[in-house]
Each structure stands twice: as structure tokens, then as C-alpha cells.
Swiss-Prot record:
Gene3D superfamilies: Ribosomal protein L28/L24 (2.30.170.40)
Protein name, as recorded: Large ribosomal subunit protein bL28
Source lineage: Bacteria, Bacillati, Cyanobacteriota, Cyanophyceae, Synechococcales
Organism: Synechococcus sp. (strain RCC307)
An example Gene Ontology molecular-function term: structural constituent of ribosome
Gene Ontology process terms (BP): translation
Record region (Disordered): 1-21
Name of the gene encoding the protein in the UniProt record: rpmB
Cellular-component GO terms for this entry: ribonucleoprotein complex; ribosome
InterPro entries: Ribosomal_bL28, Ribosomal_bL28/bL31-like_sf, Ribosomal_bL28_bact-type, Ribosomal_bL28_sf
Length: 78
């Protein structure tokens, strides 16, 4: 399974690691993904999702159903 957030679509970022001598090497900055079982009130059931921690904060603020609707994701298919 690829390291992509199922809700926000966040994925790894290509960056550079810069040493003290300013030697640059390529570095992959991974997304902080968590496997979570979230309660979906509208569907009256649990939904298992692999989401980023920033998406979890947004879910706490807006609610799972509202956030998924905003992103155009159908939770019934998950």
C-alpha cells in the first residue's frame, strides 16, 4: 500500500538534506500516516482509514462526514 492519505491525498515530498559543509543530498520527507478506525455518524458505522495527522485534526474540527463531503469522497465505498 502506498503512503498516501486516503482523505487529503497527501504524499511524500522530495527535499534536500543539507549538511554543515552545505553538501546537498536528496531526501524523501514522508507523510505522518496513521491507521485509524473512525466513527462515521451519518453511515452509523466505523470506517477504517489511513489518514495523515493533519487530516485527523481537520476531522476533529469539522467532523468526518462533513470533511469527506467537502473533498468529494464517498465513505460508503470505503
Amino acid at each position: 500500500m502506498s503512503r498516501v492519505c486516503q482523505l487529503s491525498g497527501k504524499r511524500a515530498n522530495n527535499g534536500m538534506a543539507v549538511s554543515h559543509s552545505h553538501v546537498r543530498t536528496k531526501k524523501l520527507q514522508q507523510v505522518n500516516l496513521q491507521q485509524r478506525r473512525l466513527w462515521w455518524a451519518e453511515g452509523n458505522r466505523w470506517v477504517k482509514l489511513r489518514v495523515s495527522t493533519s487530516a485527523l485534526r481537520t476531522i476533529q474540527k469539522k467532523g468526518l462526514g462533513a470533511y469527506a463531503k467537502e473533498l468529494g469522497i464517498n465513505l460508503a465505498k470505503i
